[in-house]
Amino acid sequence: MEAIVQYFSDFTLVKAIDMAGLVLGLIYLWLEFKASIWLWLVSVIMPIVHGYLYWARGLYADFGMEVYYVLAAIYGYAMWRWSRSRAVETQDLASPSNGELPITHFPLRRVLPVTLIGLALWAVIYWILITFTDSSVPLCDSFTTALSMVALWALAQKYAEQWLLWLVVDAVCTVLYIYKQIPFTACLYAFYTVMAVLGYRQWLKKIPTT
């Protein structure tokens, strides 16, 4: 309790942004849980909030990730709204989806190439951090950033297993943000970790049956 009082007694812009990020994150999570296309709108707003926060705390890879989030949000919205190829594959054209992409499983044929791409991203981001920044946590920062990039792509493809990728990211980020003294964001990611399990189960129920 004393720690909470101390936290608010020295209220700063970074702490205010930390709280704003918490609220936006909860809204985003609810929309993702419901598989609502509007999650991509929040995905454009959140990077502005979190980008400042991560830069202020020296999480440079996470800061760079926010630029990717904005671009991925545009791509994700387009994929969910207008892609029809997998709707044809799953014979889900008769469902009331208004042309939106259906939820499907992560194809086994993509596991190996996506894994290799993820490892390559991790290595490149790690090298960038240790070469050009003063990051104190380059290994964890680069890992969560690389895996987040893969997970966000999987979300744009509307694969149910994207939740499992986020489960790993969120668990690691929770510990990382506690270490970096960003308590509200740490609490948000702890909640994300739990919701990733529930979200995965929810999305499995939404996969079209043939």
Where are these regions (language model features)?
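Polytopic alpha-helical membrane-helix bundles and their juxtamembrane interface segments
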Residues: 1-35, 39, 83-92, 96-210
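Hydrophobic/aromatic-rich structural module bridging two neighboring secondary-structure elements via a short loop
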Residues: 43-96
